[in-house]
């Protein structure tokens, strides 16, 4: 299966880096099935970035959590990760809480909106996907195929 990643530099050998803030599925290396989404990730750096392609081969011995859709379990998992609580999964896959959804997640986590209000606000205009790798063993499922520079067409 082909996965994409967008960044500001070539990432031939992915790593799990601790960022300044917790992401949807906690610290990890994030990819997507969607080419256009990876392009948006790459272009967030001043309109120029690197688009990567990886070959992903699943390993049945790894602990994987997959959310097919935005569900109550997905919301609770993201809130827990965004609050800085680690999990025991090698790989987590599911929808993204994009920038707008992130604000709703944060408002829900802070008790500013109800669960029902979150779901009313959280309707996506386009589908999203992310798969995050959280252990060295999980990164072994990825093989770098290529990375190339792209520019914003605007």
Predicted regions and their residues:
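ADP-ribose/NAD+-binding catalytic cleft of ART/PARP-like enzymes
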Residues: 1-25, 152-153
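Short, conserved beta-strand segments within well-ordered enzyme catalytic domains
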Residues: 3-5, 30-31, 53-55
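A broad, structure-centric signal for solvent-exposed, well-ordered loop/edge residues
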Residues: 11-13, 38, 63
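Surface-exposed loop/turn and secondary-structure junction residues enriched for glycine/proline
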Residues: 14, 19, 28, 65, ...
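Extended catalytic/binding region for NAD+/ADP-ribose chemistry, centered on the ART fold
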Residues: 20-45
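Conserved NAD+-utilizing ADP-ribose enzyme module
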Residues: 24, 44-154
């Amino acid at each position: 299966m082909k996965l994409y990643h967008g960044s500001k530099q070539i990432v031939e050998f992915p790593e799990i880096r601790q960022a300044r803030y917790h992401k949807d599925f906690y610290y990890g290396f994030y990819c997507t099935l969607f080419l256009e989404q990876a392009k948006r990730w790459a272009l967030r750096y001043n309109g120029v970035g690197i688009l990567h392609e990886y070959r992903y081969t699943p390993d049945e011995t790894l602990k994987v959590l997959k959310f097919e859709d935005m569900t109550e379990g997905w919301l609770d998992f993201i809130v827990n990760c965004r609050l800085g609580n680690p999990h025991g999964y090698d790989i987590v896959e599911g929808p993204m809480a994009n920038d707008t959804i992130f604000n709703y997640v944060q408002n829900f986590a802070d008790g500013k909106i109800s669960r029902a209000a979150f779901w009313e606000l959280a309707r996506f205009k386009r589908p999203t996907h992310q798969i995050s790798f959280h252990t060295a063993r999980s990164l072994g499922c990825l093989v770098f195929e290529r990375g190339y520079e792209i520019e914003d067409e605007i």
